[in-house]
């Protein structure tokens, strides 16, 4: 007897439905996308109990005639494409012709639709993939689809659904993302017979964001745009003070489609690097219009993931666009003081020496020297200029082209509108210091609090970055031997130029080992060896921006070690010098780790606390 059998059509449909219909939210997504593709201006979504017993999506799109209404439930029946050539220039959200057939295979579906100008509409009822009713009906132009009893005939799938409240959350997430993708469409969302929201459909994405996320996100938005012959970008990003523990507030849209893409995420991360704390993520609403032939959306059943034909170009455009906007906006966070509390109820956060002070080992003598030189700057010496820089090695050509985007942008800084912090803190009056850690200054109706370590760290970070091509190295007292795996040794030789740029000079030493002859001057021997090993590990990952990250991490660490610390007492001259240097930095608002350098408190806020004004 044969062991291999051809499956019947009913079983095939159920298997295929499993790829398209994971849960009720998948159904809502497919139906809304069909409505958008139909040219709808108004879409209504109604669900009950997480969409398991009932989903309804209605629209005022082009509608269908009787023949199309029946064909729509056939597998791979679509109006979006006609041949395989169309797959290379997809301009619609749907194109496979699987959605309705897959949905109908695992539920009870009722479709009512009418074309413009038709006297009557068409009603089609499908149960478990089989058409059980087809009649004429009276209905408005467009399409209305009701889906009942999801997975009624696949109990194994149904038992893996979450509770209704969780499934409702997934649906709300889908509707939210689709609202953001098409601000020109008015969406009405009703959950368990309660209206959740209505969007205006006026085409203004800021209005949609305000409606969905409230004023906190809306008021924090920075707008940036970029346009070339075949690429158009609009990015709305929250200021650095608005950040989250995950990427849930990052929305990427390419040609109207919500997508996930590592290149876009990497570009956002790199642009915000040093502006927000580590492992925190900004709010970003990114809209891209690009020639459909330059992307591939047909790589995943849900069409969530896409590929760009030129990932590097996309990274560069997104990175520069966001970075430009960060330079143009005032990023000083304003302290919000709750009016209900009086001064005796407000808890003042304390910072212990253990939390704030970086401890130095005996191998960090070079770092201590750099720090002490800060005190001598007022005698005519500039610590971080020629005396601390080696002449550029003639053997060093331009850094690996993975760094090109970052460095090209660094060279363009002068063309970007500089921050206005210099104006804000010019003619200030130094009030004093607090806890030997914070500097308090006053100007007009605002007083500012500056973290002295974060400020100096930012200054040094930008100085070291500008000197990166001439970074100082030193010969080690005792040669440092590093044992490597055979493939790692090959990688080290392949990336020798990059490692030289990072301050490491080495040569092969026996089997699967190298010997470090020179290391960055700012590092002690134990740190230099461990950092070299960490760098080799990261080089194994060929992500687009890793080499940029290696450069960043090295410089950030050096700046942190050399900066003045919390509990260091600074003289008035030193404070003035710190301010002069801070005013000319590219980003005076955060330290390289993304913590705030400066915060502002207004006179009005203080007067409200003391009830001078109500």
From Swiss-Prot:
It comes from the Bacteria. GO terms for cellular component: mismatch repair complex. SUPFAM superfamilies: ATPase domain of HSP90 chaperone/DNA topoisomerase II/histidine kinase, DNA mismatch repair protein MutL, Ribosomal protein S5 domain 2-like. One of its GO terms (biological process) is mismatch repair. Keywords: DNA damage, DNA repair. GO terms for molecular function: ATP binding; ATP hydrolysis activity; ATP-dependent DNA damage sensor activity; mismatched DNA binding. InterPro entries: DNA_mismatch_repair_CS (IPR014762), DNA_mismatch_repair_MutL (IPR020667), DNA_mismatch_S5_2-like (IPR013507), HATPase_C_sf (IPR036890), MutL/Mlh/PMS (IPR002099), MutL/Mlh/Pms-like (IPR038973), MutL_C (IPR014790), MutL_C_dimsub (IPR042120). PROSITE patterns: DNA_MISMATCH_REPAIR_1. This protein is involved in the repair of mismatches in DNA. It is required for dam-dependent methyl-directed DNA mismatch repair. May act as a 'molecular matchmaker', a protein that promotes the formation of a stable complex between two or more DNA-binding proteins in an ATP-dependent manner without itself being part of a final effector complex. Belongs to the DNA mismatch repair MutL/HexB family. This is DNA mismatch repair protein MutL. The lineage of its organism: Bacteria, Bacillati, Bacillota, Clostridia, Thermoanaerobacterales.
